[in-house]
Amino acid sequence: MDCGNPLFLQWIQEWMEESTRRFPKSYQTWRKAYDSMKSCPITFHRPSQALALKGIGPTICAKLEKKWNAYCLENNIPISTHNEQNDSHVNANKSSSETSSEKPRSVKKPTTRKRKVYVPSYRSGAYSILCALYMLNKHEFATKPQIVTMAQPYCDSSFGSATDRNMRYTAWSAMKTLITKNLVYQTGHPSKYCLTDDGEEVCIRLAKVDDSFQRKHTVSNFSVSKSDDHDSSLCQPPNFVTSINKAGSSSDHGGELHVTYCPVDHNEVSDGVETDIDVDQVDSLTGIHDHHIINNEQLIDLTEQEKKQPNESNLSNLKIETVLFSNCTVFLLIDTREIRSPLDRNLIIDKLTNDFGVNCQVRSLELGDALWVARDMESGQEVVLDFVVERKRYDDLVASIKDGRFHEQKARLKKSGIRSVTYILEESSYDESFTESIRTAVSNTQVDQLFHVRHTRSLEHSVSLLAEMTKQINLFYEKRKTLAVIPDLSIEAKTYESLREQLLKIDPSTPYHISYHAFSSVLSKSSTLTVGDIFIRMLMTIKGISASKAIEIQKKYPTFMHLFEAYEKSSSSQERNLLLNKTCQGYGFQTIGPALSAKVASVFFPES
């Protein structure tokens, strides 16, 4: 069967072949249009008539029409008279056919279907998260541990771990669904969450028929200190948001109406499944109530709220929480990578627990091989204490020095803000040609980073040392009696280091702590790296640039662009080669010598 429109077919074939190179996902669409046009024996007067073919829609027709007009213009062909000799293929009535062919067929606009508002299943993860966030003041932020504490009573699934071995997700997995559907706003690092305007609207409508959705608490009710004066305004949504005037709000329920929306079989529904209840239907159920909707709204410029963020120049809004150490139990956390076999578990965990009476747990730690936390027995929140241990065998130390992990690890330990960092070095067989390298690494660690280094004969000796350290840590904090804790809502990964420096300037004698959740988030290797972090890693790939030297360079030139611009402004190659030697004059091992400075310049600004 011959194609009635070979020219149109040729154009569609060209676009189909082009899609294989540029837009692979659209190839099948063009393939269907090509096959449909090829199998059609009828000759069309205008490309718009091809809408009658299956697989050719308004977009392809518009593209054909544009190409057709350009073709006619280029070849001096009257658009209205072209292909009139083929009218017999179109219709017996020539006059009506010509009239209809001159006008492009009007395309009926697709009807837009009303989007069904998402309503989570009763007592699911999404339901309980919305319920918890609605308890807070409007646009008040909360962290994951605070939300979990508030949400768990309203959820049948566990937020902590999967209750069924076959389940891969916990109730917290529903948070991703809520963020995707624009019901919850996520910001910061560590992440903070609050309801969006859409989420607020859904909760307000659910509150009319469900007593669980009530304004009950503020974030401070769930903080470690139980302080009532916590300033929740430290975090606010960006730009402009709608704020409700509390004085003008009112809610009056004439009677109680309980609605349970769950499947007929009473089995739990996954969070991703929407119920059959539309929010509009929920509204219709509340006609028996005299419910007054809050309508007194005002816009707040939240650029002013950003000034309340604790930074180098403003700490007035920071409310340090105080935790009584007598209400806490100290736990020693061991990294999972240290427990590689049942033998390791017997030597480390069982020996610490049974022989020394140490409370210990195995977790995947973001930093260090051993870490101490104080768990508040009332709230359950864990506070990271000012002690961390990194354990290395001599052979592992040699390997980490070779590949640069040792320097990067020390930089992360320094960045953590923990005051007491201890390296435990265990004796083991190693290449003795690296003896001098080990001595240099140990002395640098003690003098430059001011870390403690302890040598042990074996794993058993290291375990005994951990038990003794646990005992001394308990005695240290028993004398202090209280723990000063920075609230999670006041912590941001970008400003955490400078925040600690400012607090130490104000009160050097007080160690400031953060929660285990915030600690893991701020120091996570998988978290988003800043441009400055990437620049430090770039510098450390150059032989001779240690972590301390890379940090010293990054202090003067925060990003690679700053250093590159400084090289561009140099008047000569000699000035460029000595740039870092003159501008980065640290002390000891942080000094950049002339040879190393020239080496960095040759890498980042090679001579043409």
Swiss-Prot record:
Gene Ontology CC entries for this record: Holliday junction resolvase complex; mitochondrion; nucleus
Keyword Hydrolase carried by entry: yes
Claim: Nucleus is one of the keywords in the record: yes
Compositional bias segments (type: Polar residues): 82-93
UniProt region (Disordered), positions on chain: 82-114
Known EC number: 3.1.22.-
Biological process terms in GO annotation: DNA catabolic process; double-strand break repair; double-strand break repair via break-induced replication; double-strand break repair via homologous recombination; meiotic joint molecule formation; mitotic DNA replication checkpoint signaling; mitotic intra-S DNA damage checkpoint signaling; postreplication repair
Complex formation: Interacts with eme1. Associates with chromatin. Interacts with the FHA domain of cds1, and this may require prior phosphorylation of Thr-275.
PANTHER family: CLASS II CROSSOVER JUNCTION ENDONUCLEASE MUS81, CROSSOVER JUNCTION ENDONUCLEASE MUS81
Protein's recorded name: Crossover junction endonuclease mus81
Annotated organism of origin: Schizosaccharomyces pombe (strain 972 / ATCC 24843)
